[in-house]
């Protein structure tokens, strides 16, 4: 009797661990990262990224070995106090932030070998709207996605360049971004920037302002060459 109970207990524990690993595989902080990014989830099960402590320039760097967003969406916690989100309701303060230490730029850098599947909304819990750069050299598939409370949103297959703690630009050598049939809603952001070696459009991108840079290139934070969104079918900038 004890053996049967023990076997059932072990089976339950295994299934719980297995399910946690499957969930965690969608979003995994790079174990080799030097930054203190932590993962959590809301009471309703929405994944939360407690962003790393920003430097004195207001830059928060967050490195992942796997980075994906499913239909539940995802919350970037840039708040030093309890706050309410659209996706996950009430969220506790980010323990990595001291009072008045919110980031003004959040970099999400994927160091693994898989492309990112972005199939839900990304929301920033932040007193002020924040800039976000999502970088994955392996590529990104974006479908039925959008942003909430993000000022400027950049998705790229390039390498993010930093100098003296400042973001200075992006170098692109490879990588494909695919916009899926359900498209991307960027209307909550001031502008959306897509920077990749190649871009494949299967659906619409709707934004207030859209910048697209393709091919092998280097862009800076102050000067880049972009394709006019009006020249690309399926892309609409108000």
Regions found by a protein language model. Give the residues of each.
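Bacterial N-terminal signal peptides that target proteins for export
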Residues: 1-10
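Bacterial N-terminal signal peptides
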Residues: 11-21
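Solvent-exposed adhesion/ligand-recognition segments of exported proteins
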Residues: 23-238
């Amino acid at each position: 009797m004890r053996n049967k109970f023990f076997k059932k207990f072990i089976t339950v524990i295994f299934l719980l661990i297995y399910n946690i690993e499957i969930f965690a595989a969608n979003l995994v902080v790079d174990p080799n990262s030097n930054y203190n990014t932590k993962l959590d989830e809301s009471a309703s099960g929405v994944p939360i990224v407690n962003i790393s402590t920003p430097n004195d320039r207001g830059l928060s760097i967050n490195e992942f070995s796997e980075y994906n967003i499913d239909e539940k969406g995802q919350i970037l916690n840039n708040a030093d106090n309890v706050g309410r989100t659209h996706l996950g309701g009430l969220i506790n303060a980010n323990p990595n932030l001291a009072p008045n230490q919110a980031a003004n730029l959040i970099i999400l850098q994927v160091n693994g070998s898989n492309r990112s599947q972005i199939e839900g909304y990304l929301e920033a819990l932040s007193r002020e709207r924040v800039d976000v750069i999502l970088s994955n050299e392996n590529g990104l598939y974006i479908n039925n996605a959008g942003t909430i409370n993000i000022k400027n949103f950049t998705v790229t297959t390039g390498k993010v360049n930093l100098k003296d703690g400042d973001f200075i630009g992006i170098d692109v050598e490879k990588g494909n971004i695919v916009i899926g049939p359900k498209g991307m809603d960027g209307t909550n952001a001031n502008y959306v920037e897509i920077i990749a070696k190649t871009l494949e459009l299967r659906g619409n991108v709707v934004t207030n302002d859209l910048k697209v840079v393709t091919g092998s290139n280097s862009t800076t934070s102050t000067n880049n060459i972009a394709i006019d969104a009006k020249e690309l079918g399926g892309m609409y900038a108000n």
